[in-house]
Amino acid sequence: RARWDAFVRARPEGTFFHLSGWQQVLEQAFGHRTHFLYLEQQGQIEAVLPLAEVKSRLFGHSLVSTPFCVYGGPIATAPHHRDALLDAATRLATELGVDHLELRSMSRQAPDWPCKELYVTFRKEISADDEQNLKAIPRKQRAVVRKGIDAGLHSEIDTGIDRFFHAYSSSVRNLGTPVFSRKYFRVLREVFGDECEILTITRQGETVASVMSFYFRDQVLPYYGGGTEAARACKANDFMYWALMCHAAGRGIRLFDYGRSKIGTGAYDFKKNWGFTPEPLYYEYHLVKGQALPDLNPLNPKYRLLINTWQRLPLWLSQWIGPWVSRYLG
């Protein structure tokens, strides 16, 4: 694992989601089988491809690089090393009898495969100076951040997951999305240590928002987060991302990765309002047993009734049922 991670960190195309720790996370938190492939020559790793198998009667059977992650796909020192791993992955997909093999990348890895460009990512360099970062936010959004600052909000690094889980689960329930388990977030903290951090926002001692972020090289990735019902009135979510930007800059971070969003959604518009430019993501598919590309996303009309029902669930019930569903939504 140390050699794998050293290779990932040394490659410019390496991401947090290529790290070997995801093997432990996916197996321990969800019980999914992992297949982390690598190519070695003369004792040196030349290519890696993290893969995990997600199998469910309701949502199908897939082999993905990497489930629950926005990025993945192969990393290689040369195209022929990459192609060798892709050949191994397609053979594995056939042996496992999956519906499809999926690669999630920031550039095309298998040009002959069908590709979906449903998602974009938002990444932007930040300054070491907080005032410069504030000035870089477009005027209208900057005014919203200032309202949060004036609302008496307070940010702090959280050592536990309870306050985060309450804010996060409230938010995703309201969106109609099944929540992940507490265990998943505990495992993330245990596996990634200081590279996985929670920032919680309070107002008069009450939690209003919280975000779990990943740190990789000089990058910060706010990945899971949300706010309570009180968050909207005091602009807690806007303040939260601003506070994270300040905190990350203090840690020497120079790239703020706002993560992926689906084109045409509210999250997409929110990130554009911060002055971030969308960059395309390429999700490529090799069909094995499947006859069509998968369409497992909230914009699919097939899931509209389920989403509407989920939004009306009591919070405690969504927290109990959610993990049984979300483990297959990788």
What are these regions (language model features)?
Residues R1-Q44, L49-G60, H100, S105-A233:
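A conserved beta-strand-loop-helix scaffold within acyl/acetyltransferase catalytic domains
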Residues F36, L49, E53, S107-Q132, ...:
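Active-site/acyl-donor-binding loops of N-acyltransferases
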Residues L37-V48, L58, C69, T77-L92, ...:
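Aromatic (often tryptophan-rich) hydrophobic motifs at membrane interfaces
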Residues S62-V70, L118:
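Residues forming anionic-ligand binding surfaces in small-molecule and nucleic-acid pockets
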Residues T66, K135-V144, N297-R304:
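Short intrinsically disordered coil segments
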Residues P74:
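Active-site phosphate/ATP/adenylate-binding loop shared across adenylate-forming ligases
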Residues D83, A93-S105:
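Short secondary-structure capping/junction motifs at helix and strand boundaries
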